[in-house]
Regions:
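PLP-dependent enzyme catalytic core of the Aspartate aminotransferase-like
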Residues: 16, 101, 142, 169, ...
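Glycine-centered tight turns that cap/initiate beta-strands
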Residues: 99, 170, 342-345, 392, ...
């Protein structure tokens, strides 16, 4: 276990996919969400639950092993900022559920999105993004990253000509959400993947609201041309599911050919800050995830805590069960709102009149969109009166909890946007965002009716 030989291409074992035990079986999603990453009990104690490895550092057997690990010649934990054994189970499990090559868990969904963009784009580069996205991501792209020299053009992703015209020579990625936040609009993943790959750039998709149980964006790329290359999650939402823990996950699909593109030297050329390693040579299909862990996470440190990783794993074990109930309740609420005399419009793709209804049927055969908006008749006053008199729904900024949630986007989650930008994102003064939980549907509907009584 000596140091990596000069000029060799070390095997970066820090970026492991799920184990061969699970890979060699054709297990279903519901089984994978319980077992990937920990197919056997803890070897030290026999514990069946994933242990919480609450430590910052790891003891090396000797100087030779320490040198080998720091030189990336040997796999294993080095320091808690980069890896942790609880974290590793979460990474492998989400990567397997998304059918990706590697996963990386970080401190929050915002960190996952930031790292995914920073990995491909440098000062002077450009991103094309869907315009109807989460307000925090919009602000990241429109303001924060712009200050570091990364420009973004926001487009109507349903207008392919507009997307094509937005792509420049310096464009490094197209960014989407499988279900737009907050209006649940749906991009045509296959068409946009083809467009991105035609320009030799990756398609990055936030699948927080879709979840791998309802849609796997990478799988639409079975022939490489028709799916996402990178998937990001705010694991805080449906993956955790209980509003207890912050976390984010990046999944490297392993489908994008960084070498053939010739536009991403950070992955293909020797990196002077890491022993001259080329990440495509060292990590192969997991080069993107490897680069983020070894460089961005190392240097900026948005690491997930072992305890949060454990809590997110607990949520992940029931993802399919919860999503079935979320979707069932949501469709009942959509039907209720669509018929309500105090509702001006319901923005949900399950409705036949919704502009994305055909895409909903194509990409979400199990249903989807538990987070959506509707417009109450009236203005901001009526919207806020409705919200303030709900009793079961909690008024807070989170979504995708087992508890039903509500918020007024124009004055909260999307308040940073100008009024013009809000309108382009589908946010109006009378827009209300709902996140439908898993309570009994009769109680949910009764609470909504109670709110309407105070909004007349």
């Amino acid at each position: 276990m000596g140091e990596c030989a000069k000029g060799s291409n070390p095997s970066i074992f820090l970026f492991k996919k799920g184990s061969s035990i699970m890979a060699n079986k054709n297990y279903k999603f519901e089984t994978l969400q319980l077992h990937v990453g920990q197919e056997a009990p803890d070897p030290a104690t026999g514990a069946r639950a994933v242990p919480i490895y609450q430590t910052t550092s790891y003891v090396f057997q000797d100087c030779a092993q320490a040198a080998a690990r720091f030189g990336l010649a040997e796999g294993g934990n080095i320091y808690g900022r980069l890896t942790n054994s609880t974290q590793e189970v979460l990474e492998n499990r989400v990567a397997a559920l998304e059918n990706g090559a590697a996963g990386l868990a970080v401190a929050s969904g915002a960190a996952a999105i930031t790292y995914a963009i920073e990995a491909v784009a440098r000062s002077g580069d450009h991103i094309v993004s869907q315009n109807t996205i989460y307000g925090g991501t919009y602000n990241l792209l429109n303001t924060t990253l712009k200050a570091f020299g990364v420009d973004t053009t926001f487009v109507n992703i349903h207008d392919l000509d507009q997307v094509k015209k937005a792509v420049r020579p310096e464009t490094k990625a197209i960014y989407l959400e499988t279900l737009g936040n907050p209006n649940s609009d749906i991009p045509d993943i296959e068409a946009l993947a083809q467009l991105a790959h035609k320009h030799q750039i990756p398609l990055i998709i936030d699948n927080t609201f879709g979840t791998p149980y309802l849609i796997r964006p990478i799988e639409h790329g079975a022939d490489i041309e028709h799916g996402a290359d990178i998937v990001v999650h705010s694991a805080t939402k449906f993956i955790g599911g209980h509003g207890t823990s912050l976390g984010g996950v990046i999944v490297d699909g392993g489908t994008f050919d960084w070498e053939a593109s010739g536009r991403f030297p950070q992955f293909t050329q020797p990196n002077p800050s890491y022993h001259g390693v080329s990440f495509t040579n060292a990590a192969g299909k997991a080069a993107f995830a490897a680069y983020i862990r070894a460089i961005l996470l190392r240097d900026t440190g948005a690491s997930i805590s072992p305890f949060n990783a454990f809590l997110l794993l607990q949520g992940l074990e029931t993802l399919s069960l919860r999503l079935e109930r979320h979707v069932e309740n949501t469709l009942r609420v959509v039907e209720f709102l669509s018929r309500h005399p105090q509702v001006e419009r319901v923005n949900h793709p399950s409705l036949s009149g919704h502009p994305d209804h055909k895409l909903y049927e194509k990409y979400f055969p199990k249903g989807a969109a538990s987070i959506f908006t509707f417009e109450i008749k009236g203005k901001e006053k009526e919207a806020q009166a409705f919200i303030d008199h709900l009793e079961l729904f909690s008024l807070l900024a989170n979504v995708a909890d087992v508890k039903s949630l509500v918020i007024h986007p124009a004055t909260t989650t999307h308040a940073q946007l100008s009024r013009e930008a809000q309108l382009k994102a589908g946010i109006r003064p009378n827009t209300i965002r709902l996140s439908i939980g898993t309570e009994h549907i009769d109680d949910i509907l009764a609470d909504l009716e109670h709110g309407f009584a105070y909004a007349k």
